[in-house]
Amino acid sequence: MLLNTLNAISPVDGRYRSKTKPLYAFFSEQALIKYRVQIEIEYFIALCSHPIPQLESFQHSLFEDLRSLYEQFSPEDAKAIKDIEKTTNHDVKAVEYFLKNEFDRLGISDYKEFIHFGLTSQDVNNTAVPLSIKDAVETVIRPEIEKTVLLLEKMAAQYDHIPMLARTHGQVASPTRLGKEIRVFSERIKQQMTLLDQVPHAAKFGGATGNFNAHQVAYPQID
């Protein structure tokens, strides 16, 4: 059955599909796969900054080529990973195998066993998802909220001189101005934006039980 607004699993992808389309780049399955690729790549690059003998000869000039794997991530790449998953029956492992194939293509096969080294799947997932939320907030959600605040402030100035009936305890009370009441909402939203900016985007990294066990066994000299 083809996806349409009537058989989508929720109104987010159904009735409101046209309104939520900008969020597909962050919350679709393809987006999640891309973020997993990004985490794996950046983790490998981070490993190269440590005194690991097997990675000392890795050319740092290749970091740009590695980052292009997620910066230029395509629907075809996502499909290739889904095809691998048909064999692995494991979504994160499919990403790992995809990257190993890409390392082969780039001529750096000697280093591919350090992809996903010492990690568990949730290290990747619990970093990819918070990063996607952070990017969505900064790229789409917050700018839209800012537009709403600007519109409210414009309306507040436009209607600042218009008197209106006000109430307290459900009874008629001293009058107010329409512009002032609109400004109340813009101020409330700005306060919430300040709180939104302070929300931490925590991630989880540490191996199967969070103790970096595999890392410590393999390289006990590295803290």
Positions of the model-derived regions?
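A helix-coil-helix interface module used to build multimeric assemblies
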Residues: 2-215, 219-223
